[in-house]
Amino acid sequence: KAADVVVIGTPIYNFSVPAALKAWIDQVARARETFQYTENGPVGLLKDKKAIIAVASGGTQAGSEIDFATTYLKHFLGFLGITDVTVIAADQLMVNPDKRADAISLAEQLAA
């Protein structure tokens, strides 16, 4: 809760996130800590924060209909109240190795 920016770096494994990241998500999603239930449904408590999701994949294109990892992480962060999310995708590296340089460039821009 003290962080201003949450950075998640993950591969896309079989269209989704690795088990270790899912375990972290299960530890972070805590009622009355990171979200709360209301009469109108759950409300995220982590407002005014930013997130960066850095994903890497061999064949899955980030943001495509078969990329459940990025969609899931954006939904999870939104559930917590974090809606300012930037995605850095080093995707389809087995298809186009040049995409790695593009992802590094974007990460460097964000770090500046």
Q: Where does each model-flagged region fall?
A:
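Glycine-rich phosphate/pyrophosphate-binding loop and the adjoining helix
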Residues: 63-112
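Helix-loop-strand module that forms the ligand-binding subsite of alpha/beta enzymes
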Residues: 1-71
